[in-house]
UniProtKB/Swiss-Prot annotation:
Source species: Homo sapiens (Human)
Assigned EC number: 3.1.26.4
Modified residues (Phosphoserine): 257, 277
GO molecular function: metal ion binding; RNA binding; RNA nuclease activity; RNA-DNA hybrid ribonuclease activity
CDD domains membership: RNase_HII_eukaryota_like
Top EC class, one word: hydrolase
Name of the protein in question: Ribonuclease H2 subunit A
Subunit structure as annotated in this protein's UniProt entry: The RNase H2 complex is a heterotrimer composed of the catalytic subunit RNASEH2A and the non-catalytic subunits RNASEH2B and RNASEH2C.
Function according to Swiss-Prot or TrEMBL: Catalytic subunit of RNase HII, an endonuclease that specifically degrades the RNA of RNA:DNA hybrids. Participates in DNA replication, possibly by mediating the removal of lagging-strand Okazaki fragment RNA primers during DNA replication. Mediates the excision of single ribonucleotides from DNA:RNA duplexes.
Amino acid sequence: MDLSELERDNTGRCRLSSPVPAVCRKEPCVLGVDEAGRGPVLGPMVYAICYCPLPRLADLEALKVADSKTLLESERERLFAKMEDTDFVGWALDVLSPNLISTSMLGRVKYNLNSLSHDTATGLIQYALDQGVNVTQVFVDTVGMPETYQARLQQSFPGIEVTVKAKADALYPVVSAASICAKVARDQAVKKWQFVEKLQDLDTDYGSGYPNDPKTKAWLKEHVEPVFGFPQFVRFSWRTAQTILEKEAEDVIWEDSASENQEGLRKITSYFLNEGSQARPRSSHRYFLERGLESATSL
């Protein structure tokens, strides 16, 4: 899998895809959706679609695709190569960088991981349609409540039969194939990650990348910078990363913080008071001050 585009810029999102097989434009196709890397504190999350003509679904099954989590890395790569060699299987994927995930989750307007996942999956299905793939059935491994997710996708694609289920990657071969594409891409992205920070003596033995992995936690503690925090390889919105920042990094006091602490929190209604102890005196306009004019309260 060629990830050179991602290696040039891994700070946002990157879409990669195979050529669309000619048969997939002519015959009705089934499409599967799955992801890899939703839980880790390190590295990107990858969403993938895989599709093939309905009459060739048995041929896809014959490749012995399975849930990527049950396969060794070498088996996943072998199966992906087999799919690449066929003339009836196509795929596409979105690589979402750790930086994109964290800034989305911590922005002024929150964009949580479920919403990001749903929108990414929807975007990939639409991408396949835009490329001319004759999609008639879609199977999706759920994120959140499957009924809600399915209703949302069905509304977006009313002419397509949509099925959303938990563990779909173990139930439907086309979703298993998508899970293999996603996992192969994520594994390669993590191995070949280009650190934009140009760090020296960087230890790349960071374990599985999952928050409960002791090796991953040790790597995070070793590579936190007291002022600037973590490299962009880290999802700084994850609780594990935030806890380490709170313990290891320097405290930051913003300009507004001091005045807020001195004044204390005020009720919002206090800003609308016209009289009383909390009312603030209003200063006159410069025009009146320069001329020694004051407001008359009585005649």
